[in-house]
Amino acid sequence: MLSAIDAIVSRGGRVILPAFGLGRSQELLMLLAGQGYEVWLDGMGRDIARILQKHPGALRNVGGLNHALKQTRFVRHWRMREQALRGDVIVTTAGMLSGGPVMHYMQELRHDEKSALFLTGFQVPGTNGHQLLETGRMRMERDSESPAFRVDCEVAQFSLSGHAGHAQLLEFIRACDPERVILYHGDDRQPLADDLDCEVILPEEGVPIQLSSSS
């Protein structure tokens, strides 16, 4: 991903990195630290970073985060977003383009072919981010019924998964030795269900399931 960012910045463009507020935003800042970019942080990730700094015992690499934050410029009010747009990289919520400051930045940059939006997290089908990957168009408002507009800037997705893989999930579930497992989130749940030696429920969105404790 860093080489892709280099290419965009070298040609005079700006990079928007939509990110989940907790974890991914801070991870990206640490990845970008020391690379020579002018990095701005906006949205919920900014507020969470401040909270994490107050609780260093909850972090595995508090030094790395503090180092990254010292090199990061914070968007403290909406007027500063114009300053952020003159920088190199903007890390902002929401990670699936469901709202937040990223909407403002995309309004400004969506027709700038020198710039780019790089998605770094899973995009749930039906979300704005998933629609952008599939169609090249995205909504500029939170309302799911609002019209979708063409995006001309470069769009790409990079895998920085914060989730366990198939083998890790199997190991964890087997260690718990459950009677029943409910698999809800994921691209393809059936292969994992097939590898489990217990009752597996694959609920559909909007369909209630009834749970009863065994006697």
PLM features per residue range, with description:
Residues 1-215:
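Acidic/His-rich, metal-assisted hydrolase cores and their charged scaffolds
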